[in-house]
Amino acid sequence: MKKLFKKAIAMCRDLPLNFVIVELSLYQREDSSSDNIKWISKRILEVTVTDQQWIYHLRMLNLPKLKPMSLASSDCPAREEKVSLISIEECQKFTSLVRDKNPFHQGEAAIVPAALLLEKIMEVRKGKIKEIHLTFLSPVRVNQEFSVQVVDNTVIIFQHQILCVRGTYEE
């Protein structure tokens, strides 16, 4: 998946650097889809990247700051949960590997790239995901613990009791 993310970053290299990923979908490839970039509006961009096995679809928004949304933990009791932390060093290593120059992914208060969060979700599900759709509601920061919770076919990520990511998946 890092190769797909690297390919998506390369496709978007000439875009303004203040784009953030707000939706991510990952599908097992069943057709002959091809890579493309499509402007939905002046602020919304869709990027589709493929390889032999996966279709990686990103919806990006020109939005410099996201307002946090909170959800009481009692609203969504977890059946599977993993508390994780992604260090600044891990984030820097990843961004240099995929040549990600997005300033949101740099520095002491960096936002964790979507592909690293996707890896954490795959760890919780032990790679048993065929298709996943994620909506990013608030940034997940480096060097701060976050929890990945899985209930039925829903996945959520909380950081400091703020709902950051919510999505669904199929096995």
What are the functions of these language-model segments?
Residues M1-E30, F94, K101, A109-K130:
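Active-site helix/loop of acyl-thioester processing domains in fatty-acid/polyketide metabolism
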Residues S96, F104, I121, Q144-F146, ...:
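Generic marker of "main functional regions" within proteins
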Residues M1-V83, V140-N143, Q149-E171:
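HotDog/MaoC-like acyl-thioester-processing domains
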Residues P77-A110:
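A contiguous, surface-exposed recognition patch within enzymatic or periplasmic domains that forms
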Residues R125-S147:
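A conserved acidic, glycine/proline-rich C-terminal tail/linker
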